[in-house]
Amino acid sequence: MEVINSNQIGVSFKGSGSYVPHQILTNHEISKKVDTSDEWIKSRTGISQRRISGLSENVSEMGYKAGLAAIEMAKWDIETIDLIILATSTPHDLFGSAPEIQSKLGANNAVAFDLTAACSGFLFAVITATQFLKAGSYRRAIVIGSDQLSSYVDWNDRRSCILFGDGAGALAIEATNEFDNLIGFSMRTDGQRGSFLNLPSQKNNDQIIDNINFSSGGFSTIAMNGQEVYKFAVREVPLIIDNLFKKTNFNSEKINWLLLHQANQRILDSVGDRLNISSEKILSNLSNYGNTSAATIPLMLDEAIRNKKIKENDIIATSGFGAGLSWGAALIRWG
């Protein structure tokens, strides 16, 4: 544990939570709609099923339930929460869904806002929250990753509809003068490769009056160049984690767990191989939930903590990566 000077501020990770919808969509059921099979999907992605939000479920509701579970694990009074950051690319309200979660929680003293960085979103939000805490601005923060990608999937495209699901996860973080359990982090973006994975707007051109033009509409469906995204992930993710190891004087042998964005089992295995991290250290629940974007990391984290796989003071190397293109890594000590 890294002990800090009394005039410095570190962070401690106090609780986790998660929520997934009750509707389960299996590979077999998808194969009734598009030309695919359970064996084909599992062999290429590692996914067996995914959760799909019901008509009454949305990002705010899922995020609220995950956040509440994290608060309960941390044993916090709701009134003591200062900051809520929601990582999402599929907000229930385009102007922001975090305030709705704040209201549902009754966290009246907290400022709440959304952060959009797709599948890197939760990691970026955790890093953002810790900087507020370490600066002394706030004491307690809830970071939530919640996404409802099923609303933006082309369910007739067998290349992409097999990948995505819905869910939410959360983390309770607290400032402390005793130690710092955020050992190090790094974040990157490359907009030049943004077209490899995006969700473009779908606009209709119109006029208010003559010569005053405008466009209206919403969004299309997820567009992805799977081959390029795979090459990006298996190259950049090991590099950013390895550079973080060097910066923090860590290595693959010193970590207990590798927690990656749950995008594709082949990516998880390839990153582990390139970092010389044994498969026993790679956390994965991809088979049950698929790619839930900003929710994948906290979903897996909460599952591993509640199953007592991750224990106090375990070292976790984690990385989020995806649309933007964006990617990042962090080394954390649980507790």
Swiss-Prot record:
UniProt keyword 4Fe-4S present: no
GO BP annotation list: fatty acid biosynthetic process
Protein's pathway: Lipid metabolism; fatty acid biosynthesis
Subcellular locations according to the entry: Cytoplasm
Keyword vocabulary terms for this entry: Acyltransferase, Cytoplasm, Fatty acid biosynthesis, Fatty acid metabolism, Lipid biosynthesis, Lipid metabolism, Multifunctional enzyme, Transferase
UniProt keyword Oxidoreductase present: no
Top-level taxon of the source organism: Bacteria
Record region (ACP-binding): 262-266
InterPro entries: ACP_syn_III_C (IPR013747), ACP_syn_III_N (IPR013751), FabH (IPR004655), Thiolase-like (IPR016039)
List of catalytic residues: 119, 261, 291
Main location: cytoplasm
Annotated GO MF terms: 3-oxoacyl-[acyl-carrier-protein] synthase activity; beta-ketoacyl-acyl-carrier-protein synthase III activity
Protein task: Catalyzes the condensation reaction of fatty acid synthesis by the addition to an acyl acceptor of two carbons from malonyl-ACP. Catalyzes the first condensation reaction which initiates fatty acid synthesis and may therefore play a role in governing the total rate of fatty acid production. Possesses both acetoacetyl-ACP synthase and acetyl transacylase activities. Its substrate specificity determines the biosynthesis of branched-chain and/or straight-chain of fatty acids.
Domain notes: The last Arg residue of the ACP-binding site is essential for the weak association between ACP/AcpP and FabH.
Protein name: Beta-ketoacyl-[acyl-carrier-protein] synthase III
Originating organism: Prochlorococcus marinus (strain MIT 9515)
Gene: fabH
